[in-house]
């Protein structure tokens, strides 16, 4: 009986000694540990490489301040914005070069170099002054297309006018057709054709409001601004004749 017990104990001890050791109990310098270390290093290197490539493909988003500065320097306008009738005016024009001196009754339009050149030629043919009819204006006026950097809006505030507009990858300038007085006193007595014995007269400009593309912060917006549109004669009755 005792021999049987000894035999079972010895067999049990031999089985424990012959069982493979687990990786958790492997000494630090064993081949199993080296394989795990190499695998971890390779995986870490691969993760770093993947992360670097990901950063290159998807750079970190820029700061909001940088984005605002970039948008302010190069504002792109949607062409559909100009198709709305309430934004159209015959005195506002967007063109790549200075438009002709004549003003037609068309709405907001965009001219390329060829169209503007053709209209310049037509303007020279159609706008010759007529001197043989004996007709004279009470006040002498001058009309021209101009650009503006600032203007007064309908609320009386000074606003920044957008000069250059990026539209379909082309830069257009915003022009305004203004009419001003050439001289406040076309004749020594004031307005032409006014009886200076009874009236005191002088020429002055009048203004109206048109929709223009302006800057509000870093965004472009439409506003009513004031421009010169006519030259009229102002008369007052002399008090000596009352």
Swiss-Prot record:
First and last residue of the signal peptide: 1-18
Pfam families for the chain: NGF
Tissue spec. comment: Expressed by the venom gland.
Biological process annotations from GO: cell surface receptor protein tyrosine kinase signaling pathway; modulation of chemical synaptic transmission; negative regulation of neuron apoptotic process; nerve development; nerve growth factor signaling pathway; neuron projection morphogenesis
GO molecular function, one term: lipid binding
Similarity comment text for this entry: Belongs to the NGF-beta family.
Protein name: Venom nerve growth factor 2
